[in-house]
């Protein structure tokens, strides 16, 4: 059986890693050993931070809802409880957008919450 030389395969693998490392600083962009480590670490950060981004946006939405709710005389938790009691099903992303972009609509929602909590 003939000997298989891996020059083409190895070159392709190295090229793939170096393309992923494009834009990195120093030897990380052009030395295969450091580039491979840097690309692996970048992948770990990317995986982790895709989860963190979801948390961060939810936190931002809650802050915006809280600000809008306090203008209407509620705390965030009172407002969310009131939405539940009133039977209003709306997610935090949309609610924060309403609070920031359309104060009149948010006031209407707050009035329904106030009525539901009073009843």
From Swiss-Prot:
Disulfide bonds: none annotated. One of its GO terms (cellular component) is ribosome. One of its GO terms (biological process) is translation. Coiled coil: none annotated. One of its GO terms (molecular function) is rRNA binding. It comes from the Bacteria. Keywords: Ribonucleoprotein, Ribosomal protein, RNA-binding, rRNA-binding. It holds the Pfam family Ribosomal_L20. Binds directly to 23S ribosomal RNA and is necessary for the in vitro assembly process of the 50S ribosomal subunit. It is not involved in the protein synthesizing functions of that subunit. Belongs to the bacterial ribosomal protein bL20 family. This is Large ribosomal subunit protein bL20. It comes from Caulobacter sp. (strain K31). The lineage of its organism: Bacteria, Pseudomonadati, Pseudomonadota, Alphaproteobacteria, Caulobacterales. The gene is rplT.
């Amino acid at each position: 059986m003939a000997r298989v030389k891996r020059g083409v395969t190895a070159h392709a693998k190295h090229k793939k890693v170096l393309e992923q490392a494009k834009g990195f600083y120093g030897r990380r962009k052009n030395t295969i050993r450091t580039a491979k480590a840097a690309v692996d670490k970048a992948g770990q950060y990317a995986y982790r931070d895709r989860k963190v981004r979801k948390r961060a946006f939810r936190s931002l939405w809650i802050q915006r809802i809280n600000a809008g709710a306090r203008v209407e005389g509620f705390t965030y938790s009172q407002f969310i409880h009131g939405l539940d009691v009133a039977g209003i099903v709306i997610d935090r992303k949309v609610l924060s957008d309403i609070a920031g972009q359309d104060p009149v609509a948010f006031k209407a929602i707050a009035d329904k919450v106030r009525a539901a909590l009073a009843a």
